[in-house]
Amino acid sequence: MSDSALMEKFEQEVWSKVPHREEKDGIAQIVNATPLIDLTDDLKECAKTVYDVDISDKDFKIYGKFDNTLPTGSIKVRPAANIIHDAITTGKISSGTTVIEATSGNFGIALGLLSKIGVTAIALVSRKLQEGVFKELRNGNIRIMDLDMDICPAPGMEDKQDMLVAKATAANVRSQMIELGFDPETFDNNISDIETLLAKKDIINLAKFLAKIYDLFCPEQYDNDLNVDAHRTVTGVEIDQQLHENGESLENYNIVCTFGTGGTSGGLSKYFDEQYSKKGVHVIFPPDQQDVAGIRTVGNADGLKYYNPELYAGKHQIDFEQAKPLLKFMVEKGHDMGESSALELYAALQMIYKNGGNYVVMICDGIDKYRKNFEKIGNTITPTQVSQQDVATNANDYDKVIWVHTQYTPREEGIELLAKSLGIDKSKIIIPNARTAQQLLSGQQVPEEIDQALQESKGKSLMVCMAGRTSLMAANVLAEKGIQTDSLTGGITGLPESKTKDLSQIIEQASQF
């Protein structure tokens, strides 16, 4: 049964401010449309001044659909509002309901609108979000559950690694659930299923499972057809409506978008098919291993319900490093757009250079969340990976060696082995606890102990872990904050001296404190 009082609040605080269909004088139209801005001249200038490419003789037109102007600043408010409206209508959400969802940021931020109607939202985040995203989640009164527990593999433990990570992460989730006021007994009674989901890194179904056992509402954005319908019935119609006002039609355009859940590409593809019997959506992906604003790579998209490449007009892989100068140009021109928009515009530029054409690029969010990374464009610090021989040869250059790992720590014999192998005095080796390491890897701030060690250093600082992966991650986190460090390739287990030792002689389970 619908909660009429809650629906009234929702319509007043949310629905009235987002794009939706309304009938006026018997004619259905979209209200609260976001701006559709002609970017043609600016893209011509960008191509010439930034990439030394002349597209002035190409027959093309390009618009930006600026959804960064929506409440909470992103396109994700469209499906979020559609799903919540339906959930209140059908009685799945009522006063006192808690909403939980897996998100890479923007959908969770959109759920922050629920605080305006007295509904609590919890966001499960499973990737290292940029500081600006965490800030907006917190400012939106979202309860954040951070599932990041990156663990560097330990030799001899590879087969057990996924379960080790799952158990460590489950303990982390349990403590956060308690902090949020949930009964730990319910969690403990379902621990096997939870660890299985975590071992598979299946955060999407973890959100669904927690909703089930705690009687919460999960929007299920990755599997909810209302996500796709929001773009099929509103976004597509809205763009077409605006083009018609300019004497044009979406029939003569293609849309360029990136892939998060597949809702935008899926809904707009359906609109093109139903209205114009054509494939009209070009979907853009970053390369594998490149993390761009929560946008999925092809590998991460494959297998999701709404990843349907057979519906697309084109599928493109764009290196964000190539698109960064374009992002800088457009933002400095006064266009508020985020990282995903740069990928789309760069892809559109490539297509226009080859064949011309007309495009609408989805500007899914603005630059504010990514401001810190944006300011580093053209001034990037890159960590150096160094071998044991490199360090030993230049031992006098290194003033601090910092161990970083969330599961293991060197014993006294391991510390002595590090000092001897690297030719560095043992007093220069810093061993923070596991909690401090996790705080550093979360990317939010540099823990006091590590910050102090770095500030005291009069030379280079070297990050060391078990096998080299976690230390490189830590060095990258520090680089993002403008701090230069090196990372030891292969870690402690890659040192020649360690190969003659039993691992348990030099390494032990890390303490949290």
Feature-to-residue mapping (PLM):
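PLP-dependent amino-acid enzyme catalytic core
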Residues: 1-399, 407-413, 432-441, 452, ...
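Substrate-recognition/cap helix-loop segment adjacent to the acidic, metal-dependent catalytic center
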Residues: 414-426
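Short, basic/hydrophobic alpha-helical segments
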Residues: 447-456
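Short, surface-exposed ligand- or partner-binding patches at beta-edge/loop junctions that are enriched
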Residues: 463-464
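C-terminal interaction modules of eukaryotic adaptor/scaffold proteins
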Residues: 480-481
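Extended, charged low-complexity segments
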Residues: 488-490, 497-500
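Active-site neighborhoods of enzymes that stabilize oxyanions during catalysis
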Residues: 499-513
